[in-house]
Amino acid sequence: GMLEFTMYRLFSMVHECRVHGGSLARNILSRVVMAYVQKKQRVLIRAIKKEGTFEAPHDFSHTIKMCEGYLDHGVKMGEGWLLTAEMLELIHIGVNNIVAVQPFGCLPNHIVAKGMSRKIKDNFPNANIVTLDYDPGSSIINQENRLRLMLANAD
């Protein structure tokens, strides 16, 4: 969701400062904001668990670890490593059928989703992942056919 994407962007700033350096102010600010948002995420997770209707998301530190062995945290094109980590999180909680949607012809996201879905399928043979491009130039028939094929293969 939006919270995870915000945390992904903040973590990318922290990671960039750690790997490539940067101003002390940016380094401190990104770490402080990241810690604050993580604290708020933990409050949200507790509330979702207490309510009991929905599956609570994992803490973002868990999400960060999920893509290790797949992508470096420096990959920031499209949704970068976050898309891969989220697919792996879903598989680990028993969701094997995943539709990765790339809006507006996002080529970097398309490349990451396609490339990593193959590696994920190699490591998790029951994973049924389809990538769909949704933009004005996409054929609706092609999109529907890909979804039908995915559903036909679903467990």
Predicted regions and their residues:
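An N-terminal assembly and electron-transfer interface module characteristic of large anaerobic redox
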Residues: 1-155
